[in-house]
Amino acid sequence: MLADKGDSLQGKRCMIIGGGKIARAVAEKLIEYGAIPITFSDASGHVYEPAGFSEGKLKVINQIKNERGALLGRYIISSATAEFNTPEHMLDIPCDLCFPCGAMNDIDDVAVNALADKGCQGIVEGGHNCVTPGGRKVLKKRGLLYGPHTCTLTGNAIVHALGEAANDEELKQNVHRIYNDVKDTAREFNARGDLFAGSNIAGFLRVANVMMMHGAV
């Protein structure tokens, strides 16, 4: 999405909502691409590193979360720069991109407006249906980028399909192919730039075509 606009993840300050395996895997990838993950959260609250989480600081988060029942608040013991606050104050933090990786319907219309007001350029779902229908309407109205779970979670399906034969390059090629298919489908059906609509339409067409091939339609 950023590449289509002549941009990249390099230097982008990224708010991660969640602290589970997906959230930490997202942070690892963001660091790899030169982005700066600045938050993690769980039921107890959120931790905020103003200068971002380095690989070393991410290892500390992993160690904490791998302990049964451990909460993120413990992280501030190991960092002189981190801040810990209640979940509702998380959206007060300015960011370039937001990656919700927690519960369904975490991001509603109020949350999207709050993020946009702080300069957020887009939301990329790391979990299923993190953005509510009302939130999606505000995303479109305010012109923010939106990476829906129907696109972002395809990598997991590809890995399962390829099995042990999967490698990073093949995964990257497949993800790019799916992204372009979704983008082109959205454009074809008069929904240019709407990856949520494009992915749903593309999925429907694929199922319909298979049914027709088998004489079910």
Regions found by a protein language model. Give the residues of each.
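General beta-strand structural signal in soluble alpha/beta enzymes
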Residues: 16, 39-42, 84, 99-100, ...
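Short glycine/serine/threonine-rich phosphate/pyrophosphate-binding segments
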Residues: 22-26, 106-110, 131-133, 154-156
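Conserved functional loop/turn residues at catalytic and ligand-binding sites
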Residues: 34, 102, 119
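Glycine-rich phosphate/diphosphate-binding loop of Rossmann-like nucleotide-binding domains
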Residues: 2-92
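A general structural motif
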Residues: 79-82, 99-107, 127-130
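Rossmann-fold NAD(P) dinucleotide-binding segment
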Residues: 85-95, 105-122
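Short glycine/threonine-rich loop-to-helix capping motif typified by GTGT followed
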Residues: 21-30, 112-113, 136-137, 207
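Adenosine-phosphate binding glycine-rich loop
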Residues: 2, 116-217
